[in-house]
Amino acid sequence: MLVLLGKTASGKDSLKKELIKLGYQSVVTTTTRPMRDGEINGVSYHFIDDDTFLEMEVTGQLAESTYYETAFGRWYYGSQLKDLKELSNEKKVVILNPDGIYSLMTKIDMSDWMICYIDCSEETIRKRLEQRGDDSEEAERRLEADRKDFVNIKRVCDHVFTNENNTDIESLARIIDFMYGRNSK
């Protein structure tokens, strides 16, 4: 399993799309947040309501979960156990946050997983959030949350990549694919 980890607007989703073009299967995570323009239920995320999410949590259907207090209310995120298990042992990619990584480390053998942190400056993140039209209050909340959530996260990552310009995401995907191939042999 290849895990992409990074702050908001670091380029994780763009990188995941490039890795899928290289033959990776996507592990679709679950959220209660509203869909953004261009997102597709079951492809971008499994979009569900709060009650369904909380029921899945109580019944042990989630391998990991977390929530964020946003300007629009509480949004839950998590990975369903079935989604982590049902794909073949071939190349799989999932985007997780620090809570997800730490939670999975206590539940699943991750010894053959490769965790890649996608790093970029806060200035770059601000520009990207503005370009995609995110609400300024919500953007500030996410930046503040990331400052706390990502403290010391690099220590659990196998590789750290910088994505400041977002112009050569294809090359970055090929590099990660090469490294993953070497890591999984």
Predicted regions and their residues:
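Small-molecule kinase domains that catalyze NTP-dependent phosphoryl transfer to phosphate-bearing small molecules
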Residues: E130-M179
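Conserved phosphate-donor/acceptor-positioning beta-strand/loop module used by diverse small-molecule
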Residues: K91-P98, M110-R132
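The feature captures the helix immediately C-terminal to the Walker
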Residues: K16-K17
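Short beta-strand-centered segment that lines the nucleotide-binding/catalytic pocket of NTP-utilizing
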Residues: Y24-R36
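Hydrophobic anchor at the beta1->P-loop junction of P-loop NTPases
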Residues: L4
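Walker A/P-loop
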Residues: K12-D13
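P-loop (Walker A) phosphate-binding loop of NTP-binding proteins
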Residues: K7
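ATP-dependent small-molecule kinase phosphotransfer cores
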Residues: R33-K92, P98-D99
